[in-house]
Amino acid sequence: MDPRVIALVPVVMDLLNFEPNIKHHFRAYGGWSFALEPYWKLNLTYYFDHPKFTELSGIIDPYTYRDKLIMPKLVVNCGNDEFFNNDNSRYWWHDMPYAYEMNKFVMLPNADHIVAGNSVLV
């Protein structure tokens, strides 16, 4: 991890621990959200259970590197996000280093994925 990174502030993308999280998305909606249409039209969702996708997740999923993510985190999510379920954090939050000591989680009520017109006061 680059020592210049002193904190993380991910906004609306809390899809860490991708594989169980994306399966939860499908089960919760009974299919894919309309927002994922470009991905399922290209049949990319078919590969979510493929061993090569598991291999890719091991590289691109920040959850894989959670032991190195020891800096404070402010996670900002939207309660009305079209892409991601608002309970995704249950698949990763408790596994983050210092989850309850140094990290904060904010849910913007009624905000969609674009977050336009919303602000966070911390």
Could you describe each region identified by the protein language model?
Residues 11-13, 76-78, 106-108:
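Generic beta-strand/beta-sheet core signal
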Residues 2, 60-63, 67, 82-86:
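Conserved structured core elements
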Residues 21-28, 35-36, 41-45, 51-54:
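Regulatory input/activation interfaces that engage signals or partners
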Residues 3-7, 70-72, 98-103:
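Loop/turn elements at helix/coil->beta-strand transitions in domains of secreted/extracellular proteins
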Residues 1-26:
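Primarily recognizes the serine-hydrolase "nucleophile elbow" in alpha/beta-hydrolase
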Residues 15, 48-65:
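Active-site nucleophile elbow and catalytic-triad environment of alpha/beta-hydrolase enzymes
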